[in-house]
Amino acid sequence: MLLPLKESLESTLANVAKNETLFVAYLASVDPRTKQPWCPTVRAALPLFNNAFNSSKKLNVVHVYVGNMPQWKTPHNEFRVKFGISAVPTLGKYTRDAQGNLKTSLLVDYDCLDANKFSKFIDI
């Protein structure tokens, strides 16, 4: 289920409850001229993401847009610096264990297009 990002990503991740999983789809921003994400790999991954997350009430995902191409390409992009995102698309899996520790797993770039890797990553 697609959830709105109501606050900062840091706050959203801090509020992941124990034994809960939140997915974060790090995506290229939409190009105002084409009305599509500027990154072709993101455009290719979106149908897979949307199909999986829209068809499940158990899987929660928020979409985060990393910026236009020049913003993304800067080494100081906040998603590169704060969250260690190196490519788009990236699907982050954030799970808080019973002890309260937040575990992070990432499915990066072309791996997001591999249906087997994607299904295994989201546990469907």
Swiss-Prot record:
The keyword Nucleus applies. It is found in: Cytoplasm; Nucleus. GO terms for molecular function: peroxidase activity; protein-disulfide reductase [NAD(P)H] activity. Residues 37-124 form the Thioredoxin domain. The keyword Nucleus applies. Keywords: Cytoplasm, Nucleus. It holds the Pfam family TXD17-like_Trx. InterPro entries: Thioredoxin-like_sf, TXNDC17-like, TXNDC17_dom. The active site is at 39 (nucleophile). GO terms for cellular component: cytosol; nucleus. Gene3D superfamilies: Glutaredoxin. Its main location: cytoplasm. Disulfide bonds: none annotated. One of its GO terms (biological process) is cellular oxidant detoxification. Belongs to the thioredoxin family. This is Thioredoxin domain-containing protein C21C3.12c. It comes from Schizosaccharomyces pombe (strain 972 / ATCC 24843).
